[in-house]
Design a protein with these regions (language model features):
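Hydrophobic alpha-helical and helix-loop surface patches within well-folded domains
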Residues: 75, 109-261
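Acidic/His-enriched low-complexity segments
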Residues: 1-147
Length: 261
């Protein structure tokens, strides 16, 4: 998807929205100079149906009821961030909350479609999330640079996840398991959670100048996520999965005629 995405849940006909900005797609949601080295502060005000939740990069400043059975959500200003990691997610999402207490206290949220509420296992997601924060704060020597951390399962998503600052979107089937899955799927979910979390420091706080260095952004997050999985969580075999999947994938890419130094 590109820009602001719209979907209807066939289970209850509820509408869900989410944004996707990377690479230069957020300009389809609002006018901007959509390049990573031009950063600004953002403050969203959103009018939405009264039964909807609205999520953005920053915490909610206020929510007030207005005529027409709607609420007006006002969010706190963001720190200076690139346009492509600004986010707007809205709909009647089911949600659960927790907090991480480390260098600072970080409110945590997990969101999914209402129809998937029974399939969500927030305990394991929160556990990996807290372990990731603890590990990265220690390794990077810096506290988490934003004010809250929400993780949202969205439908019709083209990627595994997207590292919007404070409001990470995930491919729904990667975050919410609707049936019994293998340990490999738990490994994949944890790796994705940690990959996106690593971007909060490297990619969101420290950002490449132009899109041709996006590979460095992603490579660092990929390395960091496997390191954090192996050293900071119960998933100590993370490097085995890296060698059997990522390494072979890189070898295949190197053989393509389109690959160049």
């Amino acid at each position: 998807g590109e820009g602001l995405q719209y979907s209807v849940d066939p289970a209850d006909n509820e509408v869900y929205l989410y944004s996707q900005g990377e690479t230069a797609y957020i300009r389809k949601m609002y006018p901007c100079f959509d390049q990573p080295d031009l950063k600004a502060t953002f403050q969203l005000t959103v009018t939405a149906p009264a039964h909807w939740e609205v999520i953005s990069n920053s915490p909610v400043k206020s929510k007030n009821a207005v005529e027409g059975n709607k609420n007006v959500w006002e969010f706190l200003p963001t720190p200076r961030i690139s346009t492509y990691i600004t986010a707007l997610i809205a709909g009647p999402y089911y949600h659960v909350h927790n907090e991480y207490v480390g260098e600072k206290t970080v409110p945590l949220g997990i969101y999914c479609r209402k129809s998937l509420a029974e399939s969500l296992d927030p305990e394991d997601i929160f556990l990996v999330t807290k372990q990731g924060f603890s590990y990265f704060e220690k390794v990077f020597g810096l506290a988490y640079p934003f004010e809250k951390y929400d993780q949202i399962a969205v439908v019709d998503f083209n990627w595994g996840a997207m590292e919007n600052s404070g409001a990470v979107t995930f491919l729904e089937n990667l975050l919410v398991f609707r049936s019994k899955v293998t340990e490999r799927m738990y490994d994949a979910r944890a790796n994705t959670i940690l990959h996106e979390m690593a971007h909060m420091w490297f990619g969101n706080m420290v950002t490449m100048q132009w899109w041709d260095d996006l590979w460095l952004n992603e490579s660092f997050a990929e390395w960091s996520s496997h390191l954090a999985s192996a050293e900071g969580t119960r998933l100590v075999t993370a490097w085995t999965g890296f060698n059997s999947e990522r390494k072979n994938w890189a070898y295949r890419q190197d053989q393509l005629s389109s690959t160049h130094p």
